[in-house]
């Protein structure tokens, strides 16, 4: 007899009614009396458990009664429909075999644990209800990302994790080296001689796959990357991590408005896909984590995203009469409190803010005709703030070189990026979606550490 999955039994319960089934999984709960008992078992294929009924007709009844939570078992028995009971069906056990025991000190007992505590046992937390739901949604959302772009003929590109350039020009990068840290080689100036390093130059973990993706967009037209990125920011907040995943599409022959249209369509697609394919998990989040989650998500997919310029946003904030922790004036980088005021109180829906001052944006963003702003846009969503940032890219070689000089960037480090502008350049646009922030928005989970399997943050690289 082949094993069935818990998911199969839930989705096709009527087909299994009255049949013999075989199921392997982990004990979630167990309670037993002198002559019968109940086990809730889960095999990881579905959010909900299945109840197993066992009695003293089994030769190993006493042994079964002493099973410990998280023990691994295999159950054989009749699948019985119970439409009038609390649970819609159960398995009447004819044979229960212990596959692997669990110690009495198993940390996840049947009670509610804080998210902080569960972070300390990240190797076990996928077994909890909350994180079973989180990581199932994360998996489905990742699949939805690929599905969205593949259905639209985007080419998936794997960009390097080790790079010699800084896509953001911010310098907050993790260095990669094999040099002897106690006695590194020095050059004539007394500085570390990176020509003796593994790559023959200074190398870092990537902060973005964008620059590499642009090279492919100018060959395949529409491409996307989806992979880990790294930022050495000492930001000990609920929204920042040192290692996180980014979705970065790049589109040739595309202006800023094309990026906005694609990003809006993508966000709605991901939400709809997850809502449709993880109804039990999403119901759990709406009931246990964020009681307004469904209303917020339905509002997103049924709304036309707002679009205003940065200048208009600043004007709204200045006239609001609101006392912000960070004062508002033209030229500042909008803070989360400003973003959430715009989305939560003014527009009450997702909002694109466009045309930011060039001095607070990256070197590769296309400068507008006013020479003060760039063709950039961030997507702000209610309850969170920014989840997407992007721009039309600067395709004019002379303008790009001048901008790099203004920011004291070494053009030699970007020679290949500049060369793209010499051989068949065209307007092109792209954006980056922080995947973890999207998962936070989908689930109502408020801390980025709780939507990534093993979070890497300032001062923490456990597991």
Curated annotation (Swiss-Prot):
Catalytic reaction annotation: tRNA(Asn) + L-asparagine + ATP = L-asparaginyl-tRNA(Asn) + AMP + diphosphate + H(+)
Full protein name: Asparagine--tRNA ligase
GO terms, biological process: asparaginyl-tRNA aminoacylation
UniProt cross-references to CDD domains, sorted A to Z: AsxRS_core, EcAsnRS_like_N
EC number: 6.1.1.22
GO (cellular component) term, any one: cytoplasm
SUPFAM superfamilies attached to this UniProt entry: Class II aaRS and biotin synthetases, Nucleic acid-binding proteins
Primary location group: cytoplasm
InterPro entries in the cross-refs: Aa-tRNA-synt_II, aa-tRNA-synth_II, aa-tRNA-synth_II/BPL/LPL, Asn-tRNA-ligase, Asp/Asn-tRNA-synth_IIb, NA-bd_OB-fold, NA-bd_OB_tRNA
Broad EC category: ligase
Keyword terms, alphabetized: Aminoacyl-tRNA synthetase, ATP-binding, Cytoplasm, Ligase, Nucleotide-binding, Protein biosynthesis
Xref: Pfam families: tRNA-synt_2 (PF00152), tRNA_anti-codon (PF01336)
SUBUNIT field: Homodimer.
Cross-referenced PROSITE patterns: AA_TRNA_LIGASE_II (PS50862)
Family to which the UniProt record says this protein belongs: Belongs to the class-II aminoacyl-tRNA synthetase family.
């Amino acid at each position: 007899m082949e094993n069935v999955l818990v998911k199969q039994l839930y989705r096709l319960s009527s087909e299994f009614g009255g049949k013999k089934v075989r199921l392997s999984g982990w004990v979630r709960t167990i309670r037993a009396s002198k002559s019968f008992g109940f086990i809730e078992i889960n095999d990881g294929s579905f959010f909900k458990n299945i109840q197993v009924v066992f009695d003293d007709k089994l030769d190993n009844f006493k042994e079964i009664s002493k099973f410990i939570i998280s023990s691994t078992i295999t159950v054989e028995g009749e699948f019985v429909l119970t439409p009038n009971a609390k649970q819609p069906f159960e398995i009447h056990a004819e044979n229960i075999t212990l596959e692997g025991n669990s110690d009495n000190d198993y940390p996840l007992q049947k009670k509610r644990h804080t998210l902080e505590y569960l972070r300390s046992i990240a190797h076990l937390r996928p077994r909890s209800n909350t994180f079973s739901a989180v990581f199932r949604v994360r998996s489905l959302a990742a699949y939805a990302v690929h599905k969205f772009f593949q259905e639209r003929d985007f080419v998936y590109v794997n960009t390097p994790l080790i790079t010699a350039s800084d896509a953001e020009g911010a310098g907050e990068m993790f260095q990669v080296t094999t040099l002897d840290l106690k006695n590194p080689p020095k050059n004539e100036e007394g500085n570390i001689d990176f020509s003796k390093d593994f790559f023959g130059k200074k190398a870092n973990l990537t902060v973005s796959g964008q620059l590499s993706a642009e090279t492919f967009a100018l060959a395949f037209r529409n491409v996307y990357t989806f992979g880990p990125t790294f930022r050495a920011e000492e930001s000990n907040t609920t929204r920042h991590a040192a290692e996180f995943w980014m979705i970065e599409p790049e589109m040739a022959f595309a202006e800023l408005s094309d990026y906005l249209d694609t990003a809006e369509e993508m966000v709605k697609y991901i939400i709809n896909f997850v809502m449709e394919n993880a109804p039990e998990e999403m119901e759990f989040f709406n009931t246990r984590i964020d009681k307004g989650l469904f209303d917020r998500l339905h509002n997103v997919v049924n709304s036309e995203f707002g679009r205003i310029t940065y200048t208009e946003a600043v004007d709204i904030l200045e006239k609001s009469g609101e006392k912000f922790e960070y004062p508002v004036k033209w030229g500042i980088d909008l803070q989360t409190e400003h973003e959430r005021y715009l989305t939560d109180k003014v527009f009450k829906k997702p909002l694109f803010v466009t045309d930011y001052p060039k001095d607070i944006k990256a070197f590769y963003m296309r400068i507008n005709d006013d020479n003060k702003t760039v063709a950039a846009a961030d997507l702000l969503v209610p309850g969170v703030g920014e989840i997407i940032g992007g721009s039309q890219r600067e395709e004019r070689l002379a303008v790009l070189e001048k901008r790099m000089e203004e920011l004291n960037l070494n053009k030699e480090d970007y020679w290949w990026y500049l060369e793209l502008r010499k051989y068949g350049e065209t307007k092109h646009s792209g954006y980056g979606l922080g995947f973890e922030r999207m998962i936070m928005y989908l689930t109502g989970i408020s801390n980025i550490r709780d939507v990534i399997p093993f979070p890497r943050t300032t001062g923490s690289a456990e597991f």
